[in-house]
């Protein structure tokens, strides 16, 4: 009987280990301290901001929320799933012609919400403490742009701080996705990086993160964790009429739960 109980205990432990390895849910949320920089120029009076002129970032730091969920399952062929959300914010000045109104150094805000739907496959799944994922990121970008007038000079009697442009747009962009993670054996420490990128050589969008995290193995079902990292987003466009060079970078930190 003792041997049977011992064998059952071993089998149960192995089954739990395999289940944890092949079906897993992780989630996290925190704050990204972004420092934006760059500019956007439009020269044909159409498209970005309906602008014939230039927007320049004021490079003011902003604390924005992010969240993510990772769902891994044991079903072959069907990809795993990662969902992400992040808010990106910038304030700057616009000079040029906006909606037919001449402006100089008009306060402008770019408020962007990004939603990432990422189906992916495990190339390595904690093999020798190493994980590699490859997939496709479907990035949904919802941008809200506001341009305010600063005075009435040349504006046809428009009052101070009147909004002269207010627009919301949604864009869907596919990107390649890759993630690599290394777990330090016999500890709760891990390090990982992920890259989302699309480029045709002239126009480029990428989103790169690198982080370390620590998992507290104190509960049998759910394990809390902390993560700290650095994130960079870069958008570069040069198609003749439009030139864009916008960058968001900074440290982020958050809480995680592993199931």
For each of these PLM feature ranges, what is it?
Residues 1-24:
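Cleavable N-terminal export/targeting peptides
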């Amino acid at each position: 009987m003792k041997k049977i109980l011992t064998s059952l205990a071993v089998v149960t432990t192995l089954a739990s280990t395999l289940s944890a390895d092949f079906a897993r849910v992780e989630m996290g949320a925190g704050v990204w301290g972004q420092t934006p920089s760059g500019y956007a120029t439009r020269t044909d009076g159409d498209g970005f901001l309906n602008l014939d002129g230039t927007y320049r970032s004021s490079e003011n730091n902003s604390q924005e929320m992010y969240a993510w969920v990772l769902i891994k399952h044991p079903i072959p062929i069907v990809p795993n799933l990662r969902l992400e959300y992040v808010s990106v914010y910038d304030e700057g000045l616009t000079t040029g012609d906006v909606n037919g109104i001449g402006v100089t150094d008009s306060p402008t805000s770019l408020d962007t919400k990004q939603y990432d739907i990422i189906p992916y496959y495990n190339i390595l799944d904690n093999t020798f403490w190493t994980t590699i994922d490859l997939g496709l990121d479907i990035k949904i970008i919802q941008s809200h742009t506001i341009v305010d007038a600063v005075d009435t000079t040349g504006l046809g009697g428009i009052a101070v701080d009147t909004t002269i442009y207010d627009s919301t747009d949604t864009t869907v962009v596919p990107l390649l996705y890759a993630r690599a993670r290394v777990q330090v054996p016999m500890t709760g420490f891990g390090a990982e990086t992920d890259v989302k990128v699309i480029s045709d050589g002239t126009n480029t969008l990428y989103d790169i993160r690198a982080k370390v995290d620590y998992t507290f193995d104190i509960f049998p079902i759910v394990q809390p964790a902390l993560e700290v990292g650095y994130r960079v987003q870069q958008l570069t466009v040069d198609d003749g009429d439009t030139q864009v060079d916008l960058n968001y970078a900074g440290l982020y930190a958050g809480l995680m739960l592993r199931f």
